[in-house]
């Protein structure tokens, strides 16, 4: 959805003729007639409900097209007050605003009204859907271009100067109007008109395509459109924001499929400053939004919407905008701030080759992590690596690394193998042959399950592909900034699916109802049940198809390991070497460019794979297993002895270790204060009968009498010794319990690691 091209309006005719880089800036004061023509009205409850229903419905439909839609930084979105959502890059024509509206609605429950071109509103499906979202229509001058009399060409020495033949520039054209070329090859804004056959443009035509340059140098027909007064649009936006509502805008002006951002239009800055200038008590905040896609035009791809930090507009900047002499500087300053905010939430590259190299660097850098990184973190990693690559690309290490990465990518294309499947293929002929066989059987089963849904929905697939490709060719012929016009493909695929899927379900339901016409069933129930069944079958085919495609992609490296094992081994070796070099380079240069980059913390958080660390863990686990086995044997040995009570254990312990008690106490406490002077050498009389059957048969009456006498004399010492012994046994028991708990935890970790390895 494009942003309006805004024109500046000054009070005097003299100021109207000034030339500036921001000729699209409108004056801070809006026409009084426009103010009176539009009066803001709060949307009715019905409109709000329809907005919520339409957003929820389309957002879930888009979830069928995209495999995953994620939001990041939604907590930064203000929950109150006027907000302008500035989104870029505009890579999906009518998909972008719906995804953004859905994320905002889901996170902070706020409604966003997008600015949309009036020409788009005239398209039946787009205009119908836009009516539910309270969109604001904008008339663009280029949409009003009409053929004019005569032909034009540019001066070879000055491309801004246009020379006319049989033209009437003085009567047919006006300053700040548009001169357009045929076949949508571009347009330019008139700066001044010297005569009927000569005028000067503010900026020269874009001559990126050879046919455009040839036409302008040899002569061509042209179109003209008068300047459009956008004061009504301004006033409507100002009032919308003044009532604490949200506006959405794509400041690039139109959708495109380039890898970098287009120059931002000044309209978004004027909207924010103009609203705060007209309503001093209003505080407008601007939230940059990054629309990040992985293959935006492909079915079942992924999308990430990232919200940046809100941009606060200082009162000093509003005062600067209020002054006619400095208002352009204020707009430029705010526009630069918005541009920096967008760059912080988007991934942009200078060319496609750079993007491919950076994505390979990111993928190979991630090989050190044993856990899967979240999608928003991958986007942030892409963004930082793009910035780092652009900054250090002339470094000899980076240049050599780039050369090797491009060679590796060429090898991947040669084998038609994606990078993430290279390491999965192991050169084991018998095992891989079995895997290919069993996975092929599984794929056949999945294919048979998905086949009914595929057959039922195939007309929509075919129609959507053909129409979207035709729309892409049309859009490419009318644009000077698109590369392949992939930005319109997803939009038309979704629109065709939304329009024809219900019709197709009705068609199949009618056939089923007709087939079952002889059954004594209610026809309405049969039709309704058939319709619901068609929806369930096709959606199930979608889910099963995802699983099947993942399995089908995994067959390629297995087949390659059977047919070209040496080539696969070399590819795996090159990948490992590249990964080691990339990890070293990123860790070295990353901390220099980004102070908050901490590779150690990243490694710790995502459980980095380290061979030395794994060996250490394995050794520790083996040691604990050995201790556990020894403990089990000791327990079995103890259980076979005739000791049947804890007290007997204590007595046996005293009987066998009485000589070492004192030494152990000295060694442990390094003190003599708690060592008993008299140890309990013999058993108590009350225990003698039990001890005689469990420890030793020799216990004469003399010894028993002597034991009683000693116990009477040395009862205190005996109690102290017994207390110390109990304490030691308790400590040993607690220590053993702790070791058992640690061993159990280690066993659980081993089981989890084994399951992850199997997965």
From Swiss-Prot:
Residues 736-759 have a biased composition (Acidic residues). It is an enzyme of class 2 (transferase). Residues 647-659 have a biased composition (Basic and acidic residues). SMART domains: PlsC. Present with 1050 molecules/cell in log phase SD medium. The gene is SCT1. Residues 70-434, 466-493, 545-759 are cytoplasmic. Pfam families: Acyltransferase (PF01553). The HXXXXD motif is essential for acyltransferase activity and may constitute the binding site for the phosphate moiety of the glycerol-3-phosphate. This is Glycerol-3-phosphate O-acyltransferase 1. The chain crosses the membrane at residues 49-69, 435-449, 451-465, 494-514, 524-544. It is found in: Endoplasmic reticulum membrane. The keyword Isomerase does not apply. A motif (HXXXXD motif) lies at residues 414-419. Its EC number is 2.3.1.15, 2.3.1.42. It comes from the Eukaryota. Residues 613-667, 684-705, 729-759 are annotated as: Disordered. GO terms for cellular component: endoplasmic reticulum; endoplasmic reticulum membrane. It catalyses: sn-glycerol 3-phosphate + an acyl-CoA = a 1-acyl-sn-glycero-3-phosphate + CoA; dihydroxyacetone phosphate + an acyl-CoA = a 1-acylglycerone 3-phosphate + CoA; sn-glycerol 3-phosphate + hexadecanoyl-CoA = 1-hexadecanoyl-sn-glycero-3-phosphate + CoA; (9Z)-hexadecenoyl-CoA + sn-glycerol 3-phosphate = 1-(9Z-hexadecenoyl)-sn-glycero-3-phosphate + CoA. GO terms for molecular function: glycerol-3-phosphate O-acyltransferase activity; glycerone-phosphate O-acyltransferase activity. Keywords: Acyltransferase, Endoplasmic reticulum, Lipid biosynthesis, Lipid metabolism, Membrane, Phospholipid biosynthesis, Phospholipid metabolism, Transferase, Transmembrane, Transmembrane helix. GO terms for biological process: CDP-diacylglycerol biosynthetic process; phospholipid biosynthetic process. Its main location: endoplasmic reticulum. Residues 688-702 have a biased composition (Low complexity).
């Amino acid at each position: 959805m494009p942003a309006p091209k805004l024109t500046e309006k000054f009070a005097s005719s003299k100021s109207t003729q000034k030339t500036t880089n921001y000729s699209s800036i409108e004056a801070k004061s809006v026409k009084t007639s426009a103010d009176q023509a539009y009066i803001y009205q709060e949307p009715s409850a019905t409109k709000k409900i329809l907005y919520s229903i339409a957003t929820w419905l389309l957002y879930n439909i888009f979830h069928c097209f995209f495999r995953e839609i994620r939001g990041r930084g939604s907590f930064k979105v203000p929950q109150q007050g006027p907000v302008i959502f500035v989104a870029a890059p505009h890579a999906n024509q009518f998909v972008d605003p719906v995804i953004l509206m859905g994320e905002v609605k889901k996170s902070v429950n706020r409604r966003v009204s997008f600015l949309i071109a009036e020409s788009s509103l005239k398209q039946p499906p787009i205009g119908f859907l836009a009516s539910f979202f309270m969109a604001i229509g904008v008339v663009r001058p280029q949409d009003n271009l009409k053929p004019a009399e005569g032909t034009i060409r540019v001066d070879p020495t000055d491309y801004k100067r246009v020379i006319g033949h049989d033209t009437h520039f003085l009567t047919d054209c006006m300053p700040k109007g548009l001169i357009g070329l045929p076949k949508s090859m571009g347009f330019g804004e008139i700066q001044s008109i010297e005569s009927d056959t000569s005028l000067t443009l503010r900026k020269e035509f874009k001559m990126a395509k050879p046919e455009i340059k040839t036409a302008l140098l040899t002569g061509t027909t042209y179109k003209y459109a008068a300047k459009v007064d956008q004061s009504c649009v301004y006033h409507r936006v100002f009032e919308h924001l003044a009532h604490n509502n949200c506006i959405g805008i794509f400041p690039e002006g139109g959708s495109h499929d380039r890898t970098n951002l287009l120059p931002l239009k000044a309209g978004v800055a004027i909207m924010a400053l103009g609203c705060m200038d007209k309503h001093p008590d209003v505080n407008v905040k601007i939230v940059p939004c990054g629309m990040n896609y992985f293959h935006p035009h492909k079915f079942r791809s992924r999308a990430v919407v990232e919200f940046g930090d809100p941009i606060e507009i200082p009162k000093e900047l509003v005062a600067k905008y209020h002054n006619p002499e400095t208002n352009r500087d204020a707009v430029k300053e705010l526009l630069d701030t918005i541009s920096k905010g967008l760059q912080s939430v988007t991934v942009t590259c200078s060319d496609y080759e750079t993007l491919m190299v950076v994505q390979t660097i990111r993928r190979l850098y991630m090989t050190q992590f044993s856990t899967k990184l979240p999608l928003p973190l991958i986007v942030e990693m892409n963004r930082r690596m793009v910035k780092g690559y652009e900054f250090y690309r002339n470094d000899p290490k980076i240049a050599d690394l780039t050369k090797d990465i491009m060679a590796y990518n060429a090898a991947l294309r040669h084998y038609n193998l994606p990078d993430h499947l290279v390491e999965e293929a192991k050169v084991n002929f018998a095992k891989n042959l079995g895997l290919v066989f069993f996975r092929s059987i599984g794929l056949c089963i999945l294919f048979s399950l998905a086949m009914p849904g595929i057959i039922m929905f195939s007309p929509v697939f075919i129609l959507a592909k053909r129409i979207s490709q035709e729309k892409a060719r049309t859009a490419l012929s009318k644009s000077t900034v698109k590369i392949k016009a992939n930005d319109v493909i997803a939009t038309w695929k979704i629109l065709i699916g939304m329009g024809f899927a219900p019709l197709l379900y009705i068609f199949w339901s009618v056939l089923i109802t007709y087939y079952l016409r002889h059954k004594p069933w209610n026809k309405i129930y049969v039709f309704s049940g058939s319709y619901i069944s068609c929806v369930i079958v096709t959606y199930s085919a979608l889910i099963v198809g995802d699983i099947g495609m993942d399995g089908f992609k995994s067959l390629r490296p297995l087949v390659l390991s059977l047919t070209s094992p040496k080539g696969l081994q070399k590819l795996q070796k090159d990948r490992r070497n590249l990964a080691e070099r990339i990890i070293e380079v990123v860790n070295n240069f990353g901390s220099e460019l980004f102070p908050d980059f901490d590779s150690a913390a990243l490694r710790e958080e995502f459980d980095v794979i380290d061979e030395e660390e794994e060996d250490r863990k394995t050794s520790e686990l083996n040691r604990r297993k050995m201790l556990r086995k020894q403990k089990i044997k000791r327990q079995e040995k103890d259980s076979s002895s005739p000791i049947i009570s804890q007290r007997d254990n204590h007595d046996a312990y005293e009987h066998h270790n009485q000589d070492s008690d004192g030494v152990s106490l000295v060694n442990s406490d390094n003190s003599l204060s708690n060592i008993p002077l008299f140890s309990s050498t013999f058993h108590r009389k009350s225990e003698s009968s039990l001890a005689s059957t469990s420890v030793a048969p020799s216990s004469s009456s003399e010894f028993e009498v002597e034991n009683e006498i000693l116990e009477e004399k040395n009862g205190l010492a005996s109690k102290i010794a017994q207390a110390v012994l109990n304490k030691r046994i308790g400590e040993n028991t607690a220590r053993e319990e702790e070791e058992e708990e640690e061993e159990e935890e280690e066993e659980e970790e081993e089981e989890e690691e084994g399951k992850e390895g199997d997965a």
